[in-house]
């Protein structure tokens, strides 16, 4: 499957099972490449990517929101400088949303911007954060406080890599697809009520929703704010728990449940979240969130 995104810099999203082993069909094997990944990404995936590009350097950071820091950013940029990376070279993100944010901001910052390709490896990043051009790091405990809008050259998605995700991580990422269904695509929402989840279709339809919104409002001046449904309260929960205990999708689920007014839709959402083993109860005090 191929999705073309039209914005300040057009790019394509490719969605295909087994794509990770065919990257050489999409990327020039002779390019000098700085691959940023983390220690949560299975080593077999990192080796599968790096072995296809003889002129690549694999830089692995510690997983978690702590990777989105000035210290890690500086380390990445310093490593690139020491290895004589130029404006003609390429940064690849191989990981989840944190790695996409970090690597994208590294690419946007180095020599005023070099090419960037995103290869998302988590449900959340394949469904949501790999499209839209938002790249950022955190500051003083505030998520995404320093960043830019920087579009990738392309996004390459292999649904098969999701098979190695822990169940909680897998389900956590699906919340963004549920959100996309609620704001724009009734049929996407209904996919979660079927007996078996069609993950490839869920990813595809979720990307189409975000593509439509991003093309209308790339820099979040109006319509794109609809993508923040559930996120205002969700981010408050994330701050309350100091980015621990609850994952991003779980916090967004709490936010959506808190803001939904239609009792029928709220009940359907509750059943879907229960099926995905996402707890919508928490011990946070409302006056502290």
Residue ranges and their predicted role:
Residues 14, 28, 105-194:
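A glycine/threonine-rich phosphate-anchoring loop and its flanking beta-alpha core
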Residues 63-64, 94-96, 229-230:
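Glycine-rich beta-strand-to-loop/alpha-helix junction loops that act as flexible
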Residues 191-287:
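Active-site segments that bind and position negatively charged phosphate/pyrophosphate groups
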Residues 98-104, 126-127, 235-236:
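Short glycine/serine/threonine-rich phosphate/pyrophosphate-binding segments
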Residues 85-117:
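Active-site and donor-binding regions of nucleotide-sugar-utilizing enzymes
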Residues 28-32, 51-57, 112, 195-198, ...:
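Short glycine/proline-enriched coil/turn segments at helix->beta-strand junctions
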Residues 1-90:
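ATP/NTP phosphate-donor binding region
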């Amino acid at each position: 499957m191929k999705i073309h995104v039209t914005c300040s810099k057009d790019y394509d999203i490719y969605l295909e099972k087994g794509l990770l082993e065919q990257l050489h069909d999409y990327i020039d094997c002779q390019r000098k490449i700085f691959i940023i990944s983390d220690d949560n990404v299975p080593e077999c995936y990192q080796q599968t990517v790096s072995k296809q590009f003889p002129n690549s350097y694999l830089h692995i950071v510690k997983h978690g929101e702590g990777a989105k820091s000035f210290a890690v950013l500086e380390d990445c940029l310093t490593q690139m400088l020491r290895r004589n990376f130029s404006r003609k070279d390429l940064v690849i993100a191989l990981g989840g949303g944190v790695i996409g944010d970090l690597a994208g901001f590294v690419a946007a910052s180095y020599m005023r911007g070099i090419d960037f390709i995103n290869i998302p490896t988590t449900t959340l990043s394949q469904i949501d954060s790999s499209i839209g051009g938002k790249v950022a790091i955190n500051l003083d405990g505030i998520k995404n406080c320093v960043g830019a809008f920087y579009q990738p050259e392309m996004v390459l998605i292999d649904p098969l890599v999701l098979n190695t995700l822990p169940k909680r991580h897998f389900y956590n990422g699906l919340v963004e697809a549920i959100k996309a269904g609620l704001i724009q695509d009734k049929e996407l929402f209904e996919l979660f009520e079927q007996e078996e989840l069609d993950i490839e279709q869920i990813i595809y339809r979720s990307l189409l929703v975000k593509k439509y919104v991003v093309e209308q409002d790339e820099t979040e001046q109006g319509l794109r704010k609809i993508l923040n449904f559930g996120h205002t309260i969700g981010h408050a929960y994330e701050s309350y728990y100091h980015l621990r205990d609850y994952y991003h999708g779980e916090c967004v689920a709490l936010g959506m449940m808190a803001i939904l007014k239609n009792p029928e839709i709220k009940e359907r959402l509750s059943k879907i979240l229960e099926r995905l083993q996402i707890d919508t109860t928490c011990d946070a005090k409302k006056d502290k969130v």
